[in-house]
């Protein structure tokens, strides 16, 4: 083989998955497939990325076109459409150099020039473990003759710039100038049947269930949607379900090259494309391929004379990963993010820090954290307690868990264990209804936090990392104080008691929502009201308002002081940040930028408050809530006294109202304490990262976000970092951003989101969990980023989740709809505190409700109507 051929053409037998940069993702996979014993891969070769680079270098105009494309927004589809079409034309018009054409022709001659081939694109960013580009570049079947093959190779090069492929790369942060295209040229096989094998169920995620899609003829009939496939579900070597479709057409190869659609005889349309035995045998081959690549695969196959040929295999990148387990037993995991109102992926340092400081062991998968509840589901008493608690908080979690429990033998039965938690509505823990209990807890927390701030100042380098585990233990000691748990549960149980008893006695739903308005000591609701006070300072100064409207970065506070009225405005903002600046969206991830680090995040909210409220709004709002709560209390007690045994019922209810108002505000304080400590940890850790960056150990200080706490410690100790590991973690994090975490996940990989089992809502309504009573109609504002908020009075906030950092927006809206949440999650608590009708846990709310639509939120009954 001469040097030109060696550089530009590689036989599939010469290729493995380490050569992605040379032969692209598809080529690397096919080369690896051809090395697996028992797997038949059609013979062929790969035209390398060096050939692509050689060809496109002949067109000076291409660099300018790619530079222009790099500046286009991924949302500007018209510009992408126009530019990508121009680039494709440019690439197709470039002549293939004679020496390259000769190398390709010589490779073809080994099988005979009249042999039919499939010509397939293979991009360097394609079919990788973290991103599958299926269908984004072109494949041409039954291509015959050197001239036709060279022409179709050029078309494959050009298909690197299809509109869909460019948009995908732009959205996933992949530079179009860095990707290269190889081309796979494989001998055609002419199958009786063909299709796709998923070695894991692509819908449920279950790794034990393989799905086979099958049709007659070439696979293009399935890929193009020309026919509905036969579907076989195979588990543990047995077909457990099959659907045989009426297959009216198939795609055949033409003798002269190309393909055509042909009708299928009526008597053959209902015949299965595969027998059960063939489907099982195909899955066995798929399991072998899956084992070779180490993850579930999406495999294209052809059946010729009862032999399966594999023409492509790529990772299934849409599956949610499964937590690692030390055994082979069944496990059931519950999402932590759904309880914490933060379902975005976390970076490795964030995951590691939350695990270090958590009260229970947590398992990582897909950049999220999960708790293993298998043991608690196994025994009747603990199962009942867990399901009751989950059912009160998030019915979708309970439904998902019950779905798993309905599967025979998935969760083994164990003898009774103590209940997982107190039964909802039961008598509260024996803690006195005394505000001094809450005051004492807060004082002890503040003293511990002050000691942490003092002690951490003296620690750097390895000494810091030796100290922090001790700080984590103190962190957990404060949180696990038995009185802390009793105070939190007292407020929650009193809420449940009031809602249960007042619905039973008076027929009134969710009465506690009104009875808890303006409850004292809620640090999160106080945070939202405090930003109204900041707006009061700014409102009288038009030049300050104008200055803030033009803020584009986070270094604005010093410049603000130079504007008339700016000193007072700066002082008010800084005072707010001193108390609440440790907070941010997704605050359980220590790597997320805090308000103190990015104060510009708050500017749009401040300006909305300036525009939408009159001076003194915070005080008035609190007083209005307080008066509503008192009025409701008097009304409820009066109605109870008119009932049989009314005095007893009224006395018990009065005690519970006092109890809920004493303790429910404290529900938000432990999270405030956690995040306050996190900011102290972060400041110390980032000072260390800054020193490492200045010393040249780190390329940038934020690289430590992609290390665990222990790995960060090792870097500080050794002054060395594994740059390759950091790059891999960054790629994985980008992939995790495209995944939606399930509420419940099994060790088989099955992702369960749960369902609402209700038939009491209007047709077309969106169902959710009612968490704050009342009905409101208004304009939907679909907001995914708090920094982009633009709200007016009467708007209804629609978003994915709301952790405590969103509470400043709550003061400006009339209602709340979220995709994630439960009865006692932070957004629900604050919605009740502010008297906002709210429905949470509405699946895909941000997609099903369009920004600007008029909607009606039924916060008492738990559904949303779209009005326009």
UniProtKB/Swiss-Prot annotation:
Alphabetic keyword roster: Antibiotic resistance, ATP-binding, Kinase, Nucleotide-binding, Transferase
The effect of disrupting this gene, in the record's words, is: Disruption mutant fails to inactivate RIF. Mutant displays a modest twofold decrease in RIF minimum inhibitory concentrations (MICs) compared with the wild-type strain.
- Stated EC number for the protein is 2.7.9.6
Q: Give the region (Rifampicin-binding) as residue ranges.
A: 330-755
Q: Name one GO molecular function term.
A: kinase activity
Q: Region labeled ATP-binding — which residues?
A: 5-317
Catalysed reaction(s)?
rifampicin + ATP + H2O = 21-phosphorifampicin + AMP + phosphate + 2 H(+)
Task: Give one Pfam hit by family name.
Answer: PPDK_N
Q: Which residue stretches belong to region Disordered?
A: 410-430
Where along the chain is ATP bound? 26, 120, 135, 139, 186, 300, 312, 314
Keyword ATP-binding found? yes
Where does the record place the catalytic residues?
A: 826 (tele-phosphohistidine intermediate)
Residues of the region (Swivel phosphohistidine) are 768-866
Q: Does this UniProt record's set of keywords contain Kinase?
A: yes
Report the InterPro entries cross-referenced here: ATP_grasp_subdomain_1 (IPR013815), PEP-util_enz_mobile_dom (IPR008279), PEP_Utilizing_Enz (IPR051549), Phosphohistidine_dom_sf (IPR036637), PPDK_AMP/ATP-bd (IPR002192)
| Known role | Catalyzes the phosphorylation of rifampicin, also known as rifampin (RIF), leading to its inactivation. Confers high level resistance to a variety of clinically used rifamycin antibiotics. Does not show phosphoenolpyruvate (PEP) synthase activity.
Report the sequence similarity comment from the record: Belongs to the rifampicin phosphotransferase family.
Domain comment (free text): Contains three domains: an N-terminal ATP-binding domain, a large central rifampicin (RIF)-binding domain and a small C-terminal swivel phosphohistidine domain that harbors the conserved histidine residue essential for phosphate transfer.
- Name the UniProt record assigns to this protein: Rifampicin phosphotransferase
Q: Which organism is it from?
A: Streptomyces sviceus (strain ATCC 29083 / DSM 924 / JCM 4929 / NBRC 13980 / NCIMB 11184 / NRRL 5439 / UC 5370)
Query: Which taxonomic lineage is given here?
Result: Bacteria, Bacillati, Actinomycetota, Actinomycetes, Kitasatosporales
Q: Which gene encodes it?
A: rph
């Amino acid at each position: 083989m001469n040097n030109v051929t060696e550089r530009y053409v590689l036989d599939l037998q010469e290729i493995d998955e380490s050569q992605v940069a040379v032969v692209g993702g598809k080529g690397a996979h096919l080369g690896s497939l051809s090395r697996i014993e028992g797997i038949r891969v059609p013979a062929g070769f790969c035209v390398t990325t060096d050939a692509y680079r050689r060809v496109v270098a002949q067109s000076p105009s291409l660099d300018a076109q790619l530079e222009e494309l790099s500046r286009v927004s991924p949302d500007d589809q018209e510009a992408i459409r126009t530019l990508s079409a121009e680039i494709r034309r440019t690439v197709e018009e470039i002549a293939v150099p004679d020496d390259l054409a000769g190398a390709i022709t010589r490779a073809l001659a080994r099988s005979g020039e009249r042999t039919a081939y499939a010509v397939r694109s293979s991009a360097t960013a394609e079919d990788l473990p973290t991103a599958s580009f299926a269908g984004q570049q072109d494949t041409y079947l039954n291509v015959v003759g050197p001239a036709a093959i060279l022409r179709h190779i050029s078309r494959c090069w050009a298909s690197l710039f299809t509109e869909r492929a460019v948009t995908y790369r732009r959205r996933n942060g992949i530079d179009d100038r860095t990707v290269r295209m190889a081309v796979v040229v494989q001998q055609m096989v002419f199958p009786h049947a063909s299709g796709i094998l998923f070695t894991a169920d692509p819908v449920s995620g279950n790794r034990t269930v393989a799905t086979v899609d099958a049709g007659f003829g070439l696979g293009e009939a399935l890929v193009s949607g020309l026919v509905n496939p036969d579907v076989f579900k195979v588990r543990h070597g047995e077909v457990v379900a099959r659907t045989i479709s009426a297959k009216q057409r198939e795609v055949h190869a033409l003798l002269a090259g190309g393909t055509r659609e042909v009708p299928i005889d009526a008597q053959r349309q209902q015949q299965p494309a595969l027998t059960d035995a063939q489907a099982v045998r195909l899955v066995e081959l798929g399991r072998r391929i899956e084992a070779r690549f180490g993850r579930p695969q999406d495999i294209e196959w052809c059946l010729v004379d009862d032999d399966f040929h594999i023409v492509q295999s790529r990772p299934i990148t849409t599956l949610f990963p499964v937590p690692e387990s030390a055994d082979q037993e069944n496990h059931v995991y519950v999402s932590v993010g759904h309880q914490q109102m933060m379902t975005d992926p976390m970076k490795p340092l964030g995951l590691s820090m939350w695990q270090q400081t958590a009260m229970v062991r947590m398992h990582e998968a897909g950049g999220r954290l999960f708790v293993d509840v298998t043991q608690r589901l196994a025994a009747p008493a603990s199962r009942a307690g867990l399901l009751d608690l989950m059912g009160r908080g998030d019915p979708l979690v309970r439904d998902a868990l019950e779905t798993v429990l309905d599967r025979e033998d998935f969760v083994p039965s164990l003898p009774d264990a103590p209940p997982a938690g107190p039964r909802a509505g039961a008598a509260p823990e024996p803690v006195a209804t005394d505000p001094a209990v809450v005051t004492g807890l807060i004082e002890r927390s503040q003293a511990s936090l002050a000691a942490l701030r003092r002690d951490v100042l003296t620690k750097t380098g390895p000494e810091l990392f030796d100290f922090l585990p001790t700080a984590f233990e103190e962190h957990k000691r404060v949180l696990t104080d038995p009185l802390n748990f009793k105070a939190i549960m007292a407020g929650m149980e009193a809420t449940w008691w009031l809602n249960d008893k007042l619905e039973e006695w008076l027929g009134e739903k969710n009465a506690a929502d009104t009875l808890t308005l303006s409850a004292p000591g809620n640090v999160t609701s106080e945070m939202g009201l405090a930003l109204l006070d900041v707006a009061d300072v700014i409102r009288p100064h038009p030049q300050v308002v104008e200055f803030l409207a033009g803020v584009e970065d986070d270094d604005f506070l010093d410049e603000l002081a130079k504007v008339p009225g700016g000193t007072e405005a700066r002082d008010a903002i800084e005072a707010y940040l001193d108390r609440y600046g440790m907070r941010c969206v997704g605050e359980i991830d220590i790597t997320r930028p805090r308000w103190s680090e990015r104060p510009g995040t708050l500017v749009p909210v401040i300006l909305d408050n300036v525009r939408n409220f009159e001076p003194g709004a915070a005080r008035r709002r609190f007083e209005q809530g307080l008066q509503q709560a008192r009025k409701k209390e008097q009304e409820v007690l009066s109605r109870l006294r008119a009932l049989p045994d009314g005095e007893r019922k009224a006395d018990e209810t009065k005690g519970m109202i006092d109890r809920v108002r004493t303790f429910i505000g404290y529900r938000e304080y432990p999270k405030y304490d956690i995040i306050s400590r996190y900011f102290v940890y972060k400041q110390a850790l980032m000072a260390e990262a800054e020193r490492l960056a200045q010393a040249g150990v780190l390329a940038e200080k934020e690289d430590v976000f992609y290390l665990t706490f222990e790995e960060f410690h090792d870097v500080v100790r050794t002054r060395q970092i594994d740059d390759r590991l950091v790059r891999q973690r960054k790629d994985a994090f980008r992939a995790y951003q495209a995944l939606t975490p399930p509420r419940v996940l099994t060790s088989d990989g099955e992702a369960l989101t749960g369902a609402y089992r209700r038939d009491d809502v209007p047709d077309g309504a969106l169902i959710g969990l009612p968490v704050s009573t009342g009905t409101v109609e208004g304009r939907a504002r679909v907001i995914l980023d708090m920094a982009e908020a633009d709200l007016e009075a009467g708007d209804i906030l629609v978003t994915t989740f709301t952790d405590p950092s969103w509470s400043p927006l709550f003061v400006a809206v009339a209602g709340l709809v979220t995709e994630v949440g439960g009865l006692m999650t932070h957004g629900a608590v604050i919605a009740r505190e502010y008297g906002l009708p709210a429905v949470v846990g509405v699946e895909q709310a941000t997609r099903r409700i369009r920004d600007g639509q008029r909607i009606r939120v039924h916060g008492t009954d738990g559904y949303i109507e779209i009005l326009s």
